[in-house]
Amino acid sequence: VQNNISFNAKKGVTRGIHAEPWDKYISIATGEIFGAWVDLRPGESFGQVYTTRLDPSKAIYVPRGVGNSFQALEDGTAYTYLVNAHWSLEQKKTYTFVNLADPELNIPWPIPLEESERSEADLHHPMLKDAKPMAPRRTMVTGCNGQLGHAIRDYVETHGLQGFEFNDIDTFDFSDPTQYDQFDWSLYGTIINAGAYTAVDKAETDEGRP
């Protein structure tokens, strides 16, 4: 969907660690990097680290929720990353971060971080113990004020499930094509439609019992 290029004039430029709500395909146009990736998705693999060097002969796929970082090892390194979602302010709210210098991660940077070039923002990212896991994609429930919608909401609240949003016709009429643009659909992984025209009481009438 969107291809980005980061040109690094001097070796030692170090960026990260950023987990974003999209997949990335990373390649190097010129130069070489040391890459470090940290799993920031909730679960048993949270905090696991993978490192490798990339040059123009190699590329790597980074799934959604895995923190990405790199260090330029040559002057004039061009780092490219193809992503499968467009940037948006709503997407940015879901980013999560961890500090490049976290001793728990113990990333073996080829150029010591104190000799590297880092941004002010990257210097102040939290350590892993304070990092917020990347939330999974959201689930939207439409028709939430009907019988089925209420049952779904009760189940979600009883079981403490996270990431659910509830809409009824007054906030999202899915029969109206003009209303779809109010949502960034890349943030959602599941849609549950609990809305329909029903007349349950007619089942108790002669008309409802042919």
What are these regions (language model features)?
Residues 178-210:
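NAD(P)H-binding glycine-rich loop region in Rossmannoid oxidoreductase-like domains
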Residues 70, 149, 200-201:
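Glycine/Thr-rich phosphate-binding loops of Rossmann-like dinucleotide-binding domains
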Residues 54-73:
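Conserved SET/PR-domain catalytic core that frames the SAM/AdoMet-binding pocket
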Residues 142, 167, 191-195:
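SDR active-site strand-loop-helix element
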Residues 1-54, 74-78, 83-137:
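Non-catalytic, conserved peripheral segments adjacent to functional cores
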Residues 163-182:
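Adenosine-cofactor binding site in Rossmann-like domains, unifying the SAM/SAH pocket
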Residues 138-159:
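N-terminal Rossmann NAD(P)H-binding glycine-rich loop of SDR-like oxidoreductase domains
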